[in-house]
Amino acid sequence: MFDIGVNLTSSQFEKDREQVVIRAKQAGVSGILITGTNAQESQQAMLLAQAYPDYCWSTAGVHPHDASQWNDAVAEQIHHMASADCVVAIGECGLDFNRNFSTPEEQERAFSAQLAIAAERSMPVFLHCRDAHSRFISFLTPWLNRLPAAVVHCFTGNRHELDECLAAGLMVGITGWVCDERRGLELRALLPHIPADRLLVETDAPYLLPRDLRPKPASRRNEPCYLPHIIRQIAEWRGEDATWLGQTTDENARRVFRLA
């Protein structure tokens, strides 16, 4: 089983990052993709991935929250990092109109620029979309035939949005959000509609600790070692065997990020 979304650069992991990776391995997690969300964190993610060869890989990009930072120097840094063997996708990039920490115009400019970098380098994109679906799809669609793959990370949309993502050929990342009995029920109902070969799984650690973990962890911090729990729950709600689903999503991740 492969965790396609871990924010291992987070300060929440500062004191025990090595132990977090060890616990993930002990739990049966076979690989981790470390998320880059701005130029500095993408650099940190790349260095962490290089510290754990053949177990950790990373993305390089600028999250929509940080899109106001986008300029030619940042673009050059992302280009440079993308040439490293351990950097396997451009992102986390996309649109987030929920809180607009960067203006929609700044987000769209950074998103378009990163799609262009991914197309130029023939790399997959690791995507973020929140409260911006129609604009997100309209921006992304013209680039899709020039990209080897596109992953919509931490999908929390509705049935119409899922159908549009699938029709566009996107891979769909599901997190422990689906384990939330308050907010995750709509997403849970959508799980059977995602073809097995388009499904990816992720913790988004240290965020989105599954609310149904028992016994409840002392800390609210999420970790990649909880990925098996998320997979077991997803498998149950899809009516599939958890071991098979873990293996299938692992194969999907290695195919999409060209790790096989």
UniProtKB/Swiss-Prot annotation:
Binding site for a divalent metal cation: 92, 128, 153
GO molecular function: 3'-5'-RNA exonuclease activity; magnesium ion binding; single-stranded DNA 3'-5' DNA exonuclease activity
GO cellular component, one term: cytoplasm
Enzyme Commission numbers on file: 3.1.11.-, 3.1.13.-
Superkingdom, taxonomy of origin: Bacteria
SUPFAM superfamilies membership: Metallo-dependent hydrolases
Keywords: Cytoplasm, Exonuclease, Hydrolase, Magnesium, Metal-binding, Nuclease
Pfam families assigned to the protein according to its UniProt record, in alphabetical order: TatD_DNase (PF01026)
Cofactor(s) essential for the protein: Mg(2+)
Entry's localization field: Cytoplasm
Main function: 3'-5' exonuclease that prefers single-stranded DNA and RNA. May play a role in the H(2)O(2)-induced DNA damage repair.
Subunit: Monomer.
UniProt similarity note: Belongs to the metallo-dependent hydrolases superfamily. TatD-type hydrolase family. TatD subfamily.
Name of the protein in its database record: 3'-5' ssDNA/RNA exonuclease TatD
